[in-house]
Amino acid sequence: MMQSFENVTVVKKANRYFDDKVTSRTVIFPDGSKKTLGIMLPGSYEFGTDKAEIMEILEGELEVFLPQESKWRTLRGGESFDVPAHSRFSLKVNETVDYCCSYVG
């Protein structure tokens, strides 16, 4: 897992969801690819995707329910999960989570 990014553009305006309980900033790379770096406060959330995503949990703990799985899975800092394009996934955030989301394709 990369610890830092170089030669990137950061969009200052925050992406805000669920009454500001989930926030992130967009990072744009020289090749045009994007990631978001964010924080999720404890709570339950459901997200939809346009592109496939790789969600890295940097710190904290959450449970994820993915469309291709039949049960909730617990993830902690240092772990990640993949989300298919054009799908929905649910999260139960048990403690504040620091995350990095990479958009694929």
Curated annotation (Swiss-Prot):
It comes from the Bacteria. Its EC number is 2.4.2.1, 2.4.2.2. The keyword Transferase applies. Catalyzes the phosphorolysis of diverse nucleosides, yielding D-ribose 1-phosphate and the respective free bases. Can use uridine, adenosine, guanosine, cytidine, thymidine, inosine and xanthosine as substrates. Also catalyzes the reverse reactions. GO terms for molecular function: guanosine phosphorylase activity; purine-nucleoside phosphorylase activity; thymidine phosphorylase activity; uridine phosphorylase activity. HAMAP family: Nucleos_phosphorylase_PpnP. It comes from Wolinella succinogenes (strain ATCC 29543 / DSM 1740 / CCUG 13145 / JCM 31913 / LMG 7466 / NCTC 11488 / FDC 602W) (Vibrio succinogenes). Belongs to the nucleoside phosphorylase PpnP family. It is an enzyme of class 2 (transferase). It catalyses: a purine D-ribonucleoside + phosphate = a purine nucleobase + alpha-D-ribose 1-phosphate; adenosine + phosphate = alpha-D-ribose 1-phosphate + adenine; cytidine + phosphate = cytosine + alpha-D-ribose 1-phosphate; guanosine + phosphate = alpha-D-ribose 1-phosphate + guanine. The keyword Lipid biosynthesis does not apply. This is Pyrimidine/purine nucleoside phosphorylase. Keywords: Glycosyltransferase, Transferase. Pfam families: Ppnp. InterPro entries: Ppnp (IPR009664), RmlC-like_jellyroll (IPR014710), RmlC_Cupin_sf (IPR011051). The lineage of its organism: Bacteria, Pseudomonadati, Campylobacterota, Epsilonproteobacteria, Campylobacterales.
